[in-house]
Structure formats: C-alpha cells, structure tokens
Amino acid sequence: MAPKGSSKQQSEEDLLLQDFSRNLSAKSSALFFGNAFIVSAIPIWLYWRIWHMDLIQSAVLYSVMTLVSTYLVAFAYKNVKFVLKHKVAQKREDAVSKEVTRKLSEADNRKMSRKEKDERILWKKNEVADYEATTFSIFYNNTLFLVVVIVASFFILKNFNPTVNYILSISASSGLIALLSTGSK
C-alpha cells in the first residue's frame, strides 16, 4: 500500500501531465464539436439561398458533409489549441506570476511555502493559456474555414454544378484547415 503523501504527489503529477497532454476534457470536446458543427452548417444557408440547392432534396448531402466537416474542424481546433497553449503559457508567465503574487495577501504570503506559491502560479498560468489558446483556435479556424468556403464557392468553383461545388468547397475548406493544423509552428 502506498503512503498517503505518495498518492497526493501522484495526483499532482497526473494533473500536471493532463495540462500538457493532447487529450481534451469533456467540456472542451463539447465546446469544440458544438462550434465546429455551427460553423460547418453555415455554408448550408449559402448554398440554399444563393446557389438554390433545395433543403429537402439535398438534406442527406448537407448532413453528411456537415458531419465530416464538423469532425475535421474540431480536429483542427484541437491541434491549434495544443500548439498555441505552450506559446501562450510562456508569454503570459510573468504577468500571471505578478497577478497571483499580488492577489495573495501578506498573511497568506507568509504562511505559504515557495512550492505552494509556484504550484498556484503554474495552475493559473495553465488556466489562462488554456482559455486563450481555445478562444484563438476557434476564431482562427472559423475564419479560415469560412474564407476558404467563400473563395472556393464563388471564385474557384463558380462554373461547377452547385452540388459538386458544395462537396468540393466544404471538403477542401475543412481538409485544408485540418491539414494546416498539423504543422508545429
């Protein structure tokens, strides 16, 4: 049986490893897939109103392409968030450290060990980096996806049949952002 201090240290290590892993929490997954579904469904309006593709006749096509696009966009969110989180954490470290130190009262400051202060700073830094990386990842990928859909639909594929135009523009847009998200820089 492991000593009590050992299990506490193990849980702290697990929390730290969780902060730096590629695995998403259920909350992050729901946020990513919800946003990805919304942004993937937006082009349906474009094709329904501008390209005159009937909603009922094209419902199966819209559903399949929206689901495929949702998966690829959520994949891109996850990859971009992972790359950005470490960069944001490094840039925000000093500011977060000052903020946490300032928030601790003098009494708390004297009672707390240096290790505990460092743990609080690390936890806050990871929380800030996670939030900023998540919001920027969603913004960046949504913008890129919608711009590529519009450019592909109205300029590159404008002479194609609307059904082929839809399939190619949604596939190209979601595939491109998924591909670009796999880069490490």
Curated annotation (Swiss-Prot):
InterPro entries: SSR3. TRAP proteins are part of a complex whose function is to bind calcium to the ER membrane and thereby regulate the retention of ER resident proteins. The keyword Transmembrane helix applies. The chain crosses the membrane at residues 28-48, 55-76, 136-157, 164-184. The gene is SSR3. Residues 1-27, 77-135 are lumenal. Pfam families: TRAP-gamma (PF07074). Residues 49-54, 158-163 are cytoplasmic. This is Translocon-associated protein subunit gamma. One of its GO terms (cellular component) is endoplasmic reticulum membrane. Heterotetramer of TRAP-alpha, TRAP-beta, TRAP-delta and TRAP-gamma. Keywords: Acetylation, Endoplasmic reticulum, Membrane, Phosphoprotein, Transmembrane, Transmembrane helix. The modification Phosphoserine is found at S7, S11, S105. It comes from Homo sapiens (Human). It is a multi-pass membrane protein. It is found in: Endoplasmic reticulum membrane. Belongs to the TRAP-gamma family. The modification N-acetylmethionine is found at M1. GO terms for biological process: SRP-dependent cotranslational protein targeting to membrane. The keyword Transmembrane helix applies.
